[in-house]
Amino acid sequence: MSEEMNDQMLVRRQKLQELYDLGIDPFGSKFDRSGLSSDLKEEWDQYSKEELVEKEADSHVAIAGRLMTKRGKGKAGFAHVQDLAGQIQIYVRKDQVGDDEFDLWKNADLGDIVGVEGVMFKTNTGELSVKAKKFTLLTKSLRPLPDKFHGLQDIEQRYRQRYLDLITNEDSTRTFINRSKIIQEMRNYLNNKGFLEVETPMMHQIAGGAAARPFVTHHNALDATLYMRIAIELHLKRLIVGGLEKVYEIGRVFRNEGVSTRHNPEFTMIELYEAYADYHDIMDLTESMVRHIANEVLGSAKVQYNGETIDLESAWTRLHIVDAVKEATGVDFYEVKSDEEAKALAKEHGIEIKDTMKYGHILNEFFEQKVEETLIQPTFIYGHPTEISPLAKKNPEDPRFTDRFELFIVGREHANAFTELNDPIDQKGRFEAQLVEKAQGNDEAHEMDEDYIEALEYGMPPTGGLGIGIDRLVMLLTDSPSIRDVLLFPYMRQK
């Protein structure tokens, strides 16, 4: 082994060998359970101690799980067995299970996985328990669990050894069960609205659909450079061109960027597209869907996050980005007429910008540096500048802006959406402008995608599209402060 075994580990290895010597498989086979601990409690906890005595003949059960506590000496003892649904107490007596199985019980360690068959009863303190008639060792644990009273105190160890976190931390287990339910309800909502779930490539020849730095890989057989996708967008819009009018995909996206409490190099997104819709329709859909998910998973659309009550039930605020900046700073970007004027205002208000930035970039910097973190309750910010929205349709009344929105809750972006740009000539011009930005040092600027332009030339109907970061949504709905708390296996720097 790569590490020296401590005394407890050595004792467990010795017990392992003793089991082999007795002809007992310490890594047993299938065990048929009658239910989870929660099922037993739901069915039997309603009865009194006396009623359970009367019903003993009908209360035969079989449970399995991990030994989390163990106490008792002599010819009887108690333990708590933990399964996915929680814990239930077992009571093991020598005269009930026999000498051989009682020896198994006596030598069992915390962390061992056991199977118990028996009948239901209540102790003198009223705790629902299983009186063992048969005790089986299913898996011998060769390492001791973390201290039962303190669990995993090292937050980094919780992330690196998630299996230990799940064993010892009920809140973590509940978070990941709710994550699964959130994604399930998202699918239910969209499927009921007539959307079709699809799968598109994760390796792209061109990194597109978002402003981000990609991971690069190489296909040896084809001698081709490929990029792990930074967005799902462009393939889904090709499907809209092809006549699949309402599509969505839930999948992994990869961005070669920093790691923080809000960012992981690989994360989960949903993107959806609806033909003959615009960003107003998508705004309505987003609000309705998130509210539905909260109600179905949590039982309420008023959720707690970091001590704050977030009201997903009431109508969400809708605010133009220019109005949001004006409310926060007094600067009215509707009246700003040139890049130079915007740069002067940035300097006046202490906004950090790059020399190459234009009007739209500077407006966005005002928003990100002065407004974004103040948006605690659900707020749709719409009307983003054209310069930072290369795939969104221009607003017909003021072409400086696009028909785009982002959703902010607890000071974080949770969704990005727009009326899709379906004019291939305009789209090509936007890509060309992005290439200029890339040449000026913007690593996140969009590449030219001639194949996508060709698809648009066949005609894409008016379309509304949406992207939601599922990890951030799960953070919100589970009151989790870090993205690592909602990823089973987050990226960790090598030790």
UniProtKB/Swiss-Prot annotation:
GO terms for molecular function: ATP binding; catalytic activity, acting on a protein; lysine-tRNA ligase activity; magnesium ion binding; transferase activity; tRNA binding. This is Lysine--tRNA ligase. Keywords: Aminoacyl-tRNA synthetase, ATP-binding, Cytoplasm, Ligase, Magnesium, Metal-binding, Nucleotide-binding, Protein biosynthesis. Belongs to the class-II aminoacyl-tRNA synthetase family. Binds 3 Mg(2+) ions per subunit. It is found in: Cytoplasm. It is an enzyme of class 6 (ligase). It comes from Staphylococcus aureus (strain NCTC 8325 / PS 47). The gene is lysS.
